């Protein structure tokens, strides 16, 4: 009996092994196709990239009423079918007889049940079929490669995009070939065939992102200024500070790329001709829409016709710009604005050119200023400076408008002005050429208004003059040049990191008067005090218009605070991201130095995590969202912004929460801006917070992205456990949090680290994964730690196999008591007798 059971078991194992050999992809999820290993739809075979993010094979669109089969690439771990590329979009197969294989000519091909060619990469490859293979990369790129030339890429799906724009993909024009890589929409949400809409970079003088319907523009972004497209509202333009960039070379090639390493973003053109940027929410199990365009009716290309400007939210939305009237009043008043507007009065330079009609007289034309505008299409470049730009336009009779942007330079327009829009908070100033009579009209109106005002002012001036004679002459008080000197020092901080053309003009940062901030905080009263930072107190305030603010006031007793405050202004004034706190302005008067931020009503993360009364407010889903949000903000600092920034003081008290408990990273006083080619730096003055500093930074002064990752790992473990890293666990021989988490991990009880207030059996695997990720982040050797993009990927990917963590860093401190946060200590100590490194605890 025992022998028969043993034989039976061996037979079953042999059968399983044979099954795996016959269909290796089903067992191991191979990522490549060779001549001898095709993919058969009838056997449900697919390719899976090594990371498990993307899958390639046959599919039928969700909700499709047909059984048509397409070949494409889609997200594997996301439960909502999200296809990012389709091969045979216009030639589907009617059944499951399709095969994907390396064809006899070495190309990747799709054939149907009758062995008819349905689709092919169609590359001229004079090689034998066994000389090529196809691999699905972790980026979602499908590559046909030549194994004779070190894997030379013969064809790739990223060079043949469909409706989705992926990280590491490029769109744009090729000056050498004349080609233009664009997105193309599906016909409908359940029909992948070629739709009516395309989107891509238009090769204008100043590149713009456009959407076309059957080659007719339906939306445009406005010109690229080096950081954003200037024709987008504020919130939409943030997208292009979040990893997108435009590049051009001397050969006419213009390309748009996405620098974000996280593949949980989806940027696609939908069948209705709308571009969406989304990111995947693991907790909500859905795609969250970040931005979309067009967004309002005013975004429609040429909505108000020639010389018409669109005002979203107003009724009617279309208005003729100053100096112009509707071309057809009846149509205009009836809501048909397509014919646009025409001039009230002809230009003087046009009359001069029309000598046959007796022209040549009259006063010179001038310009009317339109503020916060989306500039018209088809601008031309001029090398003129900001001061000379108006004259260049005025001297050219065909020039109808000009504008100046520091990132672009002088822009000129000739002929009709089309697709203008008025914004509330973004846009640039546009100057439109009008006849002198139009200027005179506005001038006369100004005189009518100003005359009585000037009269009153003259009388008041006489009274003041008479009053002044009663007093002796006194020396005029010295002009307060605090702000001017401060800004000069701040701009000096940026000069080593950026070229002059890319520097932010710090003088454009709003300046608040001291009295305004004093009034808004009720003279900095204790009841408005939100907390005490390492460099001074923070107060809640309310501006006259009702906006709530947070005011950080530099303590005069802080010897190092001025440098950190200046550094914070330099760093944060350049950053825009939904997971970073927003700087509204500053105050520099006399000895007063203050920063003004958006107010975060829920205060800081530590106020909830470590308060027994508030811990339950942060349920597990909220804590997970906070961890993900912190990662996205940190990824922006490290990779996606135009600067590379290391925070150096990431901790729970520097994570602020908005009204929806979304996290925002704050306190950039210790942040360092890196050059593009820098990966690490060192300092003789180590500043930070005990318990959050990485060992290489605390011991040797070396810091890099991985230093912030260490701090991130500590925060992860604090969020999971609801305990401070600096606190000890008496039940475990006074182990700190890292040591305690490491012990639980080795004992196979990682989920036991979770805060009992939020632990739920249904989240146990996710909690274990987060502990695992936290321990990977706090490994002692910096190179062993993941980067932030990998942390995001691990967080947002289900059923992913993670590397085992190595022992965390345990730092033994001598000569100083534990400093729990920057709120309590600012003393200097020495660590492990490293005398050259001054460590400033916060």
UniProtKB/Swiss-Prot annotation:
Pfam family, one: DUF3403
CDD domains (UniProt xref): B_lectin (cd00028), PAN_AP_plant (cd01098), STKc_IRAK (cd14066)
All copies of domain Protein kinase, residue ranges: 524-810
GO biological process, alphabetically ordered: immune response; protein phosphorylation; recognition of pollen
Spans within the Extracellular topological domain: 30-444
GO cellular component, one term: extracellular region
Cytoplasmic side: 466-842
Annotated segments matching region Disordered: 814-842
Occurrences of domain EGF-like (ranges): 294-330
Recorded GO MF terms: ATP binding; calmodulin binding; carbohydrate binding; protein kinase activity; protein serine kinase activity; protein serine/threonine kinase activity
Residues involved in ATP binding: 530-538, 552
Subcellular location per the Swiss-Prot or TrEMBL entry: Cell membrane
Ranges annotated as biased composition (Low complexity): 818-827
Sorted UniProt keywords: ATP-binding, Cell membrane, Disulfide bond, EGF-like domain, Glycoprotein, Kinase, Lectin, Membrane, Nucleotide-binding, Phosphoprotein, Receptor, Serine/threonine-protein kinase, Signal, Transferase, Transmembrane, Transmembrane helix
Transmembrane segments: 445-465
Main localisation: membrane
Catalytic residues (UniProt): 649
Modified residues (Phosphothreonine): 683, 837
Residue spans of biased composition, Polar residues class: 828-842
Residues annotated as glycosylated: 63, 94, 122, 130, 196, 260, 328, 336, 354, 396
Name of the protein: G-type lectin S-receptor-like serine/threonine-protein kinase At1g11330
Source organism of the structure: Arabidopsis thaliana (Mouse-ear cress)
Lineage: Eukaryota, Viridiplantae, Streptophyta, Embryophyta, Tracheophyta
């Amino acid at each position: 009996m025992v022998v028969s059971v043993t034989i039976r078991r061996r037979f079953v194992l042999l059968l399983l092994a044979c099954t795996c050999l016959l269909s290796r992809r089903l067992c191991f999820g191979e990522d490549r196709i060779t001549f001898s290993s095709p993919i058969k739809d009838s056997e449900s075979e697919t390719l899976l990239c090594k990371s498990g993010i993307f899958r390639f094979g046959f599919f039928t669109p969700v909700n499709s009423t047909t059984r048509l089969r397409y070949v494409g690439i889609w997200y594997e771990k996301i439960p909502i079918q999200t296809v990012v590329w389709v091969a045979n979009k216009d030639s589907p197969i009617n059944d499951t007889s399709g095969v994907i294989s390396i064809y006899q000519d070495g190309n990747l091909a799709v054939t149907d049940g009758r062995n008819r060619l349905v689709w092919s990469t169609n590359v001229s490859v004079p090689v034998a079929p066994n000389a090529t293979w196809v691999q699905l990369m972790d980026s979602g790129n499908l590559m046909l490669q030549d194994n004779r030339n070190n894997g030379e890429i013969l064809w790739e799906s990223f060079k043949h995009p469909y409706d989705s724009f992926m990280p590491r993909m490029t769109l744009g024009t090729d000056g050498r070939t004349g080609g233009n890589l664009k997105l193309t929409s599906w016909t409908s949400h359940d029909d992948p065939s070629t739709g009516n809409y395309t989107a891509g970079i238009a090769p204008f003088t100043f590149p713009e992102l456009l959407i076309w319907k059957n080659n007719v523009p339906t939306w445009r972004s406005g010109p690229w200024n080096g950081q954003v497209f200037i024709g987008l509202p504020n919130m939409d333009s943030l997208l292009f500070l979040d990893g997108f960039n435009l590049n051009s070379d001397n050969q006419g090639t213009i390309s748009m790329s996405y620098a974000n390493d996280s593949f949980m973003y989806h940027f696609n053109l939908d069948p209705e001709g709308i571009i969406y940027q989304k990111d995947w929410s693991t907790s909500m199990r859905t795609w969250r829409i970040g931005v979309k365009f067009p967004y309002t009716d005013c975004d429609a290309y040429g909505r108000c016709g020639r010389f018409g400007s669109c005002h979203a939210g107003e009724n009617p939305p279309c208005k003729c710009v100053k100096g112009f009237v509707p071309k057809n009043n009846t149509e205009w008043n009836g809501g048909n604005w397509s014919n646009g507007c025409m001039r009230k009065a002809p230009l003087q330079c046009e009359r001069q050119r029309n000598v046959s009609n007796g022209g040549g007289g009259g006063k010179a034309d001038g310009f009317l200023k339109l503020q916060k505008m989306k500039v018209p299409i088809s601008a031309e470049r001029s090398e003129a400076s900001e001061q000379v730009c108006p004259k260049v336009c005025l001297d050219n009779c065909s020039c109808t408008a000009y504008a100046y942007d520091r990132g672009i330079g002088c822009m000129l327009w000739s002929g009709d002005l089309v697709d203008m829009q008025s914004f509330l908070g973004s846009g640039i100033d546009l100057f439109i050429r009008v006849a002198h009579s139009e200027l005179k009209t506005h001038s006369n109106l100004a005189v009518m208004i100003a005359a009585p005002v000037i009269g009153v002012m003259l009388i008041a001036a006489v009274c003041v003059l008479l009053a002044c004679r009663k007093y002796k002459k006194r020396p005029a008080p010295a002009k307060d040049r605090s702000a001017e000197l401060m800004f000069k020092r701040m701009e000096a901080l940026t000069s080593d990191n950026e070229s002059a053309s890319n520097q932010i003009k710090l003088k454009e940062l709003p300046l608040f008067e001291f009295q305004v901030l004093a009034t808004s905080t009720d003279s900095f009263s204790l009841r408005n005090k939100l907390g005490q930072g390492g460099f001074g107190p923070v107060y809640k305030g309310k501006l006259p218009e009702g906006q709530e603010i947070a005011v950080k006031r530099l303590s005069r007793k802080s010897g190092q605070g001025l440098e950190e405050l200046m550094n914070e202004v330099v760093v944060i004034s350049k950053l825009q991201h939904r997971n970073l706190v927003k700087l509204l302005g500053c105050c520099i008067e006399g000895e007063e130095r203050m920063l003004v931020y958006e107010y975060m009503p829920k205060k800081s993360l530590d106020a909830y995590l470590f308060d027994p009364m508030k811990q339950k407010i942060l349920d597990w889903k909220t804590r997970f969202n906070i961890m993900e949000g912190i990662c996205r903000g940190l990824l922006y600092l490290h990779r996606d912004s135009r600067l590379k920034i290391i925070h150096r003081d990431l901790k729970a008290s520097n994570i602020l929460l908005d009204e929806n408990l979304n996290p925002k990273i704050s306190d950039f006083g210790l942040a360092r801006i890196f050059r593009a080619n820098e990966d690490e730096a060192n300092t003789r003055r180590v500043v930070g917070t005990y318990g959050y500093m990485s060992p290489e930074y605390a011991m040797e002064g070396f810091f890099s992205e991985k230093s912030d990752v260490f701090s991130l790992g500590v925060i992860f473990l604090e969020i999971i456990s609801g305990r401070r890293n600096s606190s000890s666990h008496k039940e475990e021989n006074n182990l700190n949090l890292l040591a305690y988490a490491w012990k639980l991990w080795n004992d196979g009880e990682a989920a036991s680290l979770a805060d009992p207030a939020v632990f739920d059996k249904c989240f146990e695997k996710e909690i274990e994964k987060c502990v695992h990720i936290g321990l990977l982040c706090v490994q002692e050797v910096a190179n062993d730690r993941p980067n932030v993009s990998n942390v995001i990927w691990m967080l947002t990917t289900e059923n992913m196999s993670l590397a085992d963590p190595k022992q965390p860093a345990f730092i033994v401190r001598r000569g100083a008591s534990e400093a729990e946060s920057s709120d309590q200590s600012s003393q200097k100590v020495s660590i492990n007798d490293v005398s050259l490194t001054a460590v400033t605890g916060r």
